[in-house]
Amino acid sequence: MSNTKEILEKYNIKLDTNKSQNYLIDDNKLNIILENADIQDNETILEIGAGIGTLTLPMAKKAKKVIAIEKDPIIVDILKQQIIKEKLTNIEIIKDDALKVDFPKFDKVVSNLPYQISSPVTFKLLEYPFKKAILMYQLEFAKRMQAKPDTHEYSRLSVALSYRADTKIIDTLPPEAFIPKPKIKSAVIELIPKNNKPIDKLLDNTIRALFQHRNKKAKKALIQSAHELGVDKKVLKQKLSNVTNDLFEEKVFKLTPTQIKEISLILEGNL
């Protein structure tokens, strides 16, 4: 929003990049986000890290309701004044940490996420039912979200997310699109949840154990991270000595999400 700089200057606000306070100032990029969100007048939109309302205000003009989460009390006061100025009555502000509050019911989530909480807030969102998310991340993080096996970006995040959602990069943003300029490029991701049953704890623990040693063979990685499975190393080594499945001899970064799920099922039968 072109007047973002003016608002910050008016209230003498110095943004803190250590708190991921990088505000979008490129109107073209803002419009791309709004177009892809495809907000309808019967939808409730959740926004995490609302800031001074760059996304909040235009979304509220389209949506039934916007739930805006922002934990900085000074920024919240400015947001409230912007809402009054625009004469909007369908915005609920939650002044709190997004990782510590329960989210009210919502249809879509549209946010310029604070980058330092990208991973935990994404997985928290996926515990709730919703139609679609349009979210901004660091570009490198966005690439890891949708990385394929046997690539440099393939990670625990790639696998854990693949069971829960379909993702695609719909736009990239240079540092100049923000104030202050971050040191990295950013990306806008479309995320569509999969309506699967919840991921079981053993599978999540298996992913975590494997990717602590992504360049090692699966069996060795699991043994070295046996604590993640709640098992003693020696006990796990003995149990896995009876397993002959070739997947356990494959390097972790080459395993597909389907193969990792198979490994988890084998572990379930042996632990």
UniProtKB/Swiss-Prot annotation:
Identification of the protein by name: Probable ribosomal RNA small subunit methyltransferase A
Gene name of this polypeptide: rsmA
GO molecular function (one): rRNA (adenine-N6,N6-)-dimethyltransferase activity
Native source species: Methanosphaera stadtmanae (strain ATCC 43021 / DSM 3091 / JCM 11832 / MCB-3)
Location relative to the cell: Cytoplasm
Keywords, comma-separated and alphabetical: Cytoplasm, Methyltransferase, RNA-binding, rRNA processing, S-adenosyl-L-methionine, Transferase
EC number: 2.1.1.-
Entries under PANTHER family matching the protein: DIMETHYLADENOSINE TRANSFERASE (PTHR11727), DIMETHYLADENOSINE TRANSFERASE-RELATED (PTHR11727:SF7)
Enzyme class, first EC level, given as a word: transferase
Principal localisation: cytoplasm
